[in-house]
């Protein structure tokens, strides 16, 4: 007997965004400010690739992305925005949507946080344990409605043109820390490329990943760390600054690996300040040159597009695919 077809819709825009002129404007904005929407767009592209891969393996799956209201399927995942989630809730009230999932990786402003608890939302899907714990620290009742599922990363193969060069990925960190690290690398005569968030393109990043051996990652916090995963899938280990806490407006939360929720010993190591950076970096760099890290193998097993898409289906739909 043929397996029942699974039909689902991925939403990132509300119904007003289907007009061609608005979509054209949004595409221009994406090109100009890609780094500010990299997360949601990256998640959408990952699920698209992952679902396509599962279909090729024989899973009876049909899905669409931001369709007109007449083509929305009964199962819906909202990937971006409180307005889009509100729109989806209105469709569920009209019985157009039967199962509604907020996520994965949806961000909701503090003043609209209550929309997560709307009875029409069947489940909230967050990208990491770090995000799960953070939201539970703010509201104890939310844990029963949350599940964890990361977004995957595309496998584009690895390069044979690597040099003894580092990427220093500077996203959000104190200037004093980044200055000390760059000065250290210069004194040790270690070649590096500095990438500052918002000042390069995805193509620039992919090019440098293919040319480099490892990455120093400077960021206060990550919900998941897709940029890290893109390095790992290329077999680049990461030396990540982790300051142990997150501060957002009046909220303070502490925990381990806030900057790198999916970092493992196969993928690299953390440091907490410059003193620890200076102490541990020689060992990290030598292990890198000796090939003692294996981030690509870990990423292929746990964080590929297909693996994460399959996790999402298993998690949210309670079906073992």
Question: Positions of the model-derived regions?
Answer:
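Active-site proximal beta-strand in glycosyltransferases
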Residues: 73-108, 125
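Alpha-helix C-terminal capping/helix-to-coil transition sites in glycosyltransferase folds
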Residues: 71-73, 119-120, 210-212
